[in-house]
């Protein structure tokens, strides 16, 4: 309700469970509101023309007949700057630095292509909150094992962040 009906909305999109859920939720909400989903884009990063995420993103959307929403952002390997990521996130955890390095490169690419774009949505972090994918390899995955994982420091997740119940950390 706070975004004007003509403003474009971008999703940082890998085609995984997190970004896929975010994209499909936004797509569904726009349709339910009678608004055009044409304002929605699924931005995916492709480094040096070779990207497992870009391939996965294309497969995800193509299987749903939504491939027209995908917009790959190409960058060179030199366009990935882990030192900038460390400065921005003030963190040294390897997975956080990797994630931030890619997100910054993707955002720079989007800004270069669309200098007036204002709204981006991201589903990053779900893998960490579920102790990583694929789920079939996580035989001990339960809600309790997730909540007791003290490594879930991101976004206030983790057992110390429980505010209301064992299944909602809102």
Segments from the language model and where they lie:
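ATP-dependent adenylate-handling active sites, centered on carboxylate activation for C-N bond formation
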Residues: 1-170
């Amino acid at each position: 309700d706070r975004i004007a009906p003509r403003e474009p909305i971008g999703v940082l999109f890998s085609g995984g469970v997190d970004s896929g859920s975010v994209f499909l939720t936004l797509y569904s909400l726009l349709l339910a509101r009678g608004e055009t989903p044409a304002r929605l884009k699924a931005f995916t990063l492709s480094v040096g023309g070779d990207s497992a995420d870009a391939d996965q993103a294309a497969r995800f959307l193509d299987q749903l007949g939504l491939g027209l929403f995908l917009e790959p952002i190409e960058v060179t390997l030199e366009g990935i700057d882990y030192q900038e990521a460390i400065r921005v996130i003030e963190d040294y955890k390897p997975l956080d630095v990797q994630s931030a390095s890619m997100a910054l490169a993707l955002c720079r690419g989007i800004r270069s292509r669309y200098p007036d774009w204002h709204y981006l949505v991201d589903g990053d972090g779900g893998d960490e909150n579920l102790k990583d994918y694929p789920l079939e390899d996580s035989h001990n995955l339960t809600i309790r094992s997730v909540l007791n994982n003290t490594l879930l420091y991101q976004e206030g997740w983790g057992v110390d962040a429980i505010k209301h119940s064992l299944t909602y950390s809102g």
